[in-house]
């Protein structure tokens, strides 16, 4: 039996992903060690899990290093990889927003600078609005940018909004809501179709309360 490999995101969504797979009866015994290893092999059921950075999950899946993956919709929209998005997993709820100091709301000028970890999402959003902006790509601590004058606003993912409030920023506009999605490598969907569809079915039953 061919091994099916699944890329799980390290960080805030790991626990929810593990709970979902366990509820679906997928590799229960192996997943209890998820916090200690980067690769977990369930030889009995021919399933291999790997823990990777959330931003890297689509790359692993697109290139076939993983057959399936769990990834936020925000990352999928940013990267636009060549893969299948097959299931909304209904966890990891957050919002992609434009945020900035409160006074920016009243003077939303053109030619503004936008700091973000999601340059493609930001560029597409402002282009649709017909607004001319300069995109500044950052890799972390995006909230700092308006405070130190690097940008007028930011585009970032928000869960509770607490980090924004702590830095004196407010949500100006919501771009889209985001949840975790199940993604599949296109070749794997053909070569391992039966096994992958079985996993999708089990997960869907749990999500739908079956």
UniProtKB/Swiss-Prot annotation:
Subcellular location(s) of the protein: Cytoplasm
GO cellular component, one term: cytoplasm
This enzyme's EC code(s): 2.4.2.17
Pathway: Amino-acid biosynthesis; L-histidine biosynthesis; L-histidine from 5-phospho-alpha-D-ribose 1-diphosphate: step 1/9
GO molecular function: ATP binding; ATP phosphoribosyltransferase activity
Catalysis performed (reactions): 1-(5-phospho-beta-D-ribosyl)-ATP + diphosphate = 5-phospho-alpha-D-ribose 1-diphosphate + ATP
UniProt keywords, alphabetically: Amino-acid biosynthesis, ATP-binding, Cytoplasm, Glycosyltransferase, Histidine biosynthesis, Nucleotide-binding, Transferase
Keyword ATP-binding assigned: yes
The keyword DNA-binding is assigned to this record: no
GO BP annotation list: L-histidine biosynthetic process
Domains: entry comment: Lacks the C-terminal regulatory region which is replaced by HisZ.
The protein's role, per its UniProt record: Catalyzes the condensation of ATP and 5-phosphoribose 1-diphosphate to form N'-(5'-phosphoribosyl)-ATP (PR-ATP). Has a crucial role in the pathway because the rate of histidine biosynthesis seems to be controlled primarily by regulation of HisG enzymatic activity.
Family: Belongs to the ATP phosphoribosyltransferase family. Short subfamily.
Subunit structure: Heteromultimer composed of HisG and HisZ subunits.
Name of the protein described by the UniProt record: ATP phosphoribosyltransferase
Taxonomic source organism: Caldanaerobacter subterraneus subsp. tengcongensis (strain DSM 15242 / JCM 11007 / NBRC 100824 / MB4)
Gene giving rise to this polypeptide: hisG
